[in-house]
Swiss-Prot record:
It comes from the Eukaryota. Required for the first step of diphthamide biosynthesis, a post-translational modification of histidine which occurs in elongation factor 2. DPH1 and DPH2 transfer a 3-amino-3-carboxypropyl (ACP) group from S-adenosyl-L-methionine (SAM) to a histidine residue, the reaction is assisted by a reduction system comprising DPH3 and a NADH-dependent reductase, predominantly CBR1. Facilitates the reduction of the catalytic iron-sulfur cluster found in the DPH1 subunit. It is found in: Cytoplasm. Belongs to the DPH1/DPH2 family. DPH2 subfamily. This is 2-(3-amino-3-carboxypropyl)histidine synthase subunit 2. GO terms for biological process: protein histidyl modification to diphthamide. [4Fe-4S] cluster binds at C116, C137, C371. The gene is DPH2. Keywords: Cytoplasm, Iron, Iron-sulfur, Metal-binding. Component of the 2-(3-amino-3-carboxypropyl)histidine synthase complex composed of DPH1, DPH2, DPH3 and a NADH-dependent reductase, predominantly CBR1. Pathway: Protein modification; peptidyl-diphthamide biosynthesis.
Length: 551
């Protein structure tokens, strides 16, 4: 090929040098696995450790016992997706010869929380089984069977014990050992070593298998020690230890027990744990250090709960579609919001962030429905433009008498119970329609945060008292203002009221100030036809340029 044949890309309008593209380069093509596999010396050792980490032999045995599963989806978190090709290869090598005709699909990008089973993504390929790898919340899903493979990560227990004894010098202190689902594999051994070192008041946690449905199973799950008993159930964990004279309950944990957690929990789960234990100590397995905070606080949650009391428009943000009970929770929330005279909008958003939620300015506050382990947004630094609360906090806010208990309930079933109690307080049940309570919805309300009077906290309460005139045939006005709201074609709209009060209402809103403005709308004209490279005026311009060049 000659130099004339080499195609050179067009020069950009702005100068770019090598430094502009350094973010796309990597110093090494090796993938970092040592923090969960341990030190590696060769490629053969990598293969063996991956086989042990994922318990591939036991996973293969499960699939051989269940040949009815053909379309198998493998779900990975971001930290483990690099191992997906290895796992699929190992499964295919062992299972291709049995004649079942299995197909494997890697779900590399989950729509919602990584700890939840992405049932929606699995249904896209008509999967009949989901194998979930890594940490898991064990929330019950709607339909598909699921197999959990937590993995067995490497942990230098000698270094951990040294850090532990330095942090907890009092061997009589009451301590609870906990970790994410993957590192639970090390918890019983750590408990035994601490007991042998003289720590007398230590309890440990294991995965609560009672949450599993009949179509769910855990591969190579950790079994409790034979000389320990169940002491207390805490969500998706069961606390184990030597039988004590006094039973452990929530009050005992909150007032007497320190939590030692291997790995840093996600913010929602961490906030929940701060309301359960007297103190929190987290161990970073990568840096091998213990941290004592700062951690998320309920103080901001209390403030946002009071903001929800005077919010006129509530956005219900659904951050999960797989967890059982989501639809029931949404329906009961909508009923509770309506009975309190407030407006609501329903949004289903995968991985919500600041730009996504900023698009909906009329929303005064967000109520998020998501996994309690990692699917709830805890906006600790005020990055979002509007506050974000949970269904339980919204239920507290819409009660006529606010009672702040200091608890943080994130379980759907418990939240549904609280909503039912609030509806009962309003005099409403599933067989009734309307508000039969004696509470005065027209009573003035004041913002507990600012102390100011709020007139728009119940925008729909005036619907029963609003009298509207039927529009005449000659009336071309779409929007009408009346006492109590803004009306579009006979329907009260809080969104239009919000838009009308803005200084700038969108592109074209100032056309009425231009000459030739048509009140009935723009005149319909014939537009351009054809394809973009062959518009008629483009052809005429090209012919004109060609003629000028020939002259």
């Amino acid at each position: 090929m000659s130099n004339e044949d080499i195609l050179v890309p067009a020069a950009l309008s702005t100068h770019q040098d090598e430094s502009d593209f350094t973010f796309q380069k990597f110093d090494s093509d090796s993938m970092e696995r040592s923090f969960y596999l341990g030190p590696l010396s060769s490629q053969d050792e990598l293969w063996d450790k991956l086989m042990q980490y994922y318990s591939i032999d036991k996973l293969i045995a499960y699939l051989q016992r269940n040949p009815e599963y053909v379309q198998i989806t493998l779900q990975f978190p971001d930290t483990l997706v690099k191992d997906s090709s290895f796992i699929i290869r190992a499964l295919q090598d062992k299972l291709d010869g049995d004649g079942a005709g299995r197909k494997f699909w890697a779900l590399a990008d989950t729509a919602y929380s990584a700890c939840c089973v992405d049932e929606v993504a699995a249904e896209h390929v008509k999967g009949d089984l989901v194998i979930h790898f890594g940490d898991a919340c064990l929330n019950a899903i709607q339909k598909l069977p699921v197999v959990y493979d937590f993995g067995k990560p490497f942990l230098d227990t000698d270094v951990l014990l040294a850090c532990f004894t330095e942090e907890f010098k009092d061997k009589d202190q009451k301590i609870c050992l906990m970790s994410n689902a993957s590192y639970t594999h090390h918890i019983p051994d750590l408990y035994s070593r601490l007991k042998s070192n003289g720590y007398t008041n230590v309890v440990y946690s294991v995965v609560n298998t009672g949450l599993l449905t009949e179509t769910a199973e855990i591969i190579d799950n950790t079994t409790p020690l034979s000389d320990t008993d169940e002491l207390f159930t805490l969500g998706n964990r069961v606390l184990m230890g030597a039988r004590q004279e006094e039973d452990i309950d929530e009050e005992t944990l909150r007032n007497e027990y320190a939590l030692f957690h291997i790995t840093m929990p996600h913010d929602p789960h961490l906030l929940y744990l701060t309301t359960v234990f007297e103190s929190i100590h987290t161990y970073d397995v990568a840096d091998q250090v213990i941290s004592n905070g700062p951690y998320p606080s309920l103080t901001r949650r209390y403030k946002n709960m009071h903001k929800a009391r005077t919010a006129g428009c509530i956005g219900i943000l659904v951050n999960t579609l797989s967890i059982r009970g989501t639809r029931e929770t949404v329906n009961k929330l909508i009923k509770l919001i309506r009975e309190n005279g407030k407006k609501h909008y329903l949004f289903v958003v995968g991985k919500p962030n600041v730009p996504k939620l900023a698009n909906f300015e009329p929303v005064d506050i967000w109520c998020i429905l998501g996994c309690g382990q990692s699917g709830i947004i805890v906006d600790e630094f005020g990055e979002f433009y509007k506050p974000i609360i949970t269904p339980y906090e919204l239920t507290l806010a819409l009660n006529f008498e606010v009672t702040w208990t200091g608890k943080w309930i994130i379980d759907f079933q418990k939240a549904i119970t609280e909503i039912d109690n609030s509806l009962a307080e309003l005099g409403i049940d599933d067989s009734k329609h309307g508000n039969d309570s004696d509470h005065d919805l027209d009573a003035p309300e004041f913002d507990a945060v600012t102390g100011k009077y709020v007139s728009s906290s119940r925008p729909l309460r005036a619907l029963n008292h609003l009298q509207l005139d039927a529009p005449s045939n000659e009336d071309k006005q779409v929007m009408a203002r009346v006492n109590g709201g803004t009306v579009i074609k006979g329907t009260v709209s809080t969104a239009v009221e919000h838009l009308a009060n803005r200084a700038w209402t969108g592109l074209g809103s100032d056309y009425k100030d231009d000459e030739g403005y048509e009140e009935d709308g723009a005149t319909v004209e014939e537009g351009i036809s054809g394809i973009a490279r062959g518009y008629e005026f483009d052809q005429e311009d090209a012919a004109r340029k060609s003629q000028n060049q020939s002259q």
